[in-house]
């Protein structure tokens, strides 16, 4: 008996979903595209929200920033659930490896007094700022318009919980395996003068009803704080006998660089919208500059305390320079 093997090509009955084919053509689509495009609820709402009957439960007017086609914006990272979880798993495993090395070598115990104070008084309390960031981005995920926008915001909200956990793990390690320093960090967040501007800004932004303005304010503070703590101080730690700080900072800096990609792409989409671009650009210039000014005001006492603890003046200079750069990016003109 003989057998003859043949290759048979089975053509798929469809390349992608109909709504994707109408937008991009009848061709294979990525999982990101199929899971993200045209999923925004737009009709068949049963009632308007009792707390704002002038709008639908899902409405494009929850922010002054709008896109003619919300799906003109795409997350450049192409994150949907599987690649997002894979990326973040790798990120936190890398941090865990660094923390194991830090603990094994006793590097936290060897921190100079000034650097230890920076960590305990100023860095660890920012786990509460990360928690505020999570709430702010959850608001954006709920009230934003367009699945690609709200999806990116939701993943960023998850990230803020992860960032808070990173800081918490550092605090527990620095506290000898106890949560004592985390309890102290909460009191610093609630009571210490250098942190009260940040706390006020966080609480006010949590209740901001315009998700676009809330994003601008959170982003302005992030750009000053993350650059100061995880770039500028990272460089100083390398030459100041604080390698433990540098080993932690690298992971926060890498997350921030990744997070910037979806936010910068959204700003670009707002500016380049064929119909609403000019309006969005004017709003970005106005509200972006205001957000940066507020951020500089609330971060300055924080930076001044860093200078006091480390014996210098470079922290305040750094945030002032960064604020000018961010303001220019929003307005297109030098401060």
Language-model segments: residues:
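Amphipathic, well-ordered alpha-helical segments in soluble domains
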Residues: 129-136, 163, 225-229, 259-262, ...
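Long, hydrophobic, well-ordered secondary-structure blocks that form the structural core
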Residues: 113-192
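Alpha-helical bundle segments that constitute or directly flank the non-heme di-iron/ferroxidase center
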Residues: 47, 113-144, 207-236
């Amino acid at each position: 008996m003989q057998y003859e093997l043949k290759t048979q090509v089975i053509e798929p009955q469809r390349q992608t979903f109909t709504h994707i084919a109408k937008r991009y053509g009848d061709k294979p689509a990525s999982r990101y595209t199929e899971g993200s495009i045209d999923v925004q609820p737009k009709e068949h709402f049963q009632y308007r929200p009792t707390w704002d009957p002038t709008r639908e439960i899902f409405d494009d007017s929850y922010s002054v920033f709008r896109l003619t086609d919300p799906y003109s914006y795409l997350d450049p990272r192409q994150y949907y659930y599987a690649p997002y979880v894979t990326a973040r798993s790798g990120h936190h495993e890398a941090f865990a490896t660094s923390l194991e090395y830090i603990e094994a070598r006793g590097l936290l115990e060897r921190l100079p007094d000034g650097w230890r104070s920076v960590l305990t008084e100023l860095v660890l309390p920012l786990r509460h700022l990360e928690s505020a960031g999570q709430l702010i981005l959850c608001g954006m995920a709920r009230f934003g318009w367009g699945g690609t926008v709200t999806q990116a915001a939701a993943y960023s909200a998850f990230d803020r919980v992860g960032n808070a956990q990173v800081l918490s793990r550092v605090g527990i390690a620095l506290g000898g395996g106890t949560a004592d320093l985390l309890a102290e960090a909460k009191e610093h967040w609630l009571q210490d003068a250098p942190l009260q501007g940040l706390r006020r800004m966080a609480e006010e932004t949590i209740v901001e009803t315009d998700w676009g303005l809330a994003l601008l304010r959170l982003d302005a503070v992030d750009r000053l704080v993350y650059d100061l703590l995880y770039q500028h101080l990272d460089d100083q730690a390398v030459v100041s006998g604080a390698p433990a700080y540098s080993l932690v900072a690298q992971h926060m800096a890498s997350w921030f660089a990744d997070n910037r990609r979806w936010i910068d792409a959204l700003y670009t989409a707002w500016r380049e919208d064929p119909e609403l671009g000019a309006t969005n650009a004017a709003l970005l210039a106005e509200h972006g500059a205001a957000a940066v000014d507020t951020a500089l005001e609330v971060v300055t006492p924080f930076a001044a305390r860093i200078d006091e603890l480390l014996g210098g003046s470079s922290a305040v200079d750094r945030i002032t320079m960064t604020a000018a750069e961010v303001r220019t990016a929003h307005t297109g003109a030098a401060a």
